[in-house]
Amino acid sequence: MSSKEEHMLEALQLAKRGLLTSSPNPMVGCVITHNNKVIGRGWHERSGENHAEINAIEDVFSNLGNKSKEALKESELFVNLEPCTTFGKTPPCADSISEYGIKKVYFGNEDKAQQGFSKMHPGIEVESGLLEEEGRKLNRGFFSRIEKGRPYISCKIASAL
């Protein structure tokens, strides 16, 4: 497993922390690295509150203090879902990523509800599809709502002979 996949796997693990609290939003986790060392972590804790990317950036400031802005300019961000580009209950994460000059963003899944991160912020290097299948599985309810306009439905049947 490559270091990129390890960082994305950690982001997916962080995302799972929002299982019971992030709805109706998807479960999202984020890891920020500098020289391949993790300097910030975050996840989307509750609807209407900071998204995973913002929590991870705040964690960088908590960990590095006055060295944070310089470190962020040389950093890579790993997030399981494409950063948001629209203003809802919170400002767009894409704007903060751009503002701090993060050099590269890796995300697992595209968010069809957004306007396209790479189109909105062309100066940032982007790589998508990292552990895409794992991310789709984690947020299958969200993707069903966005792509099919209906909830994800599973059915269990038990029978006795």
Predicted regions and their residues:
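Short beta-strand scaffold segments in enzyme catalytic cores
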Residues: M27-N36
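Generic beta-structure capping elements
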Residues: D59, N80, A158-A160
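Residue-level recognition of the N-termini of beta-strands and the immediately preceding loop/turn
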Residues: V28, K73-E76
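A structural motif shared across PLP-dependent enzymes of the aminotransferase-like
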Residues: L20-S23, M27, G48-H51
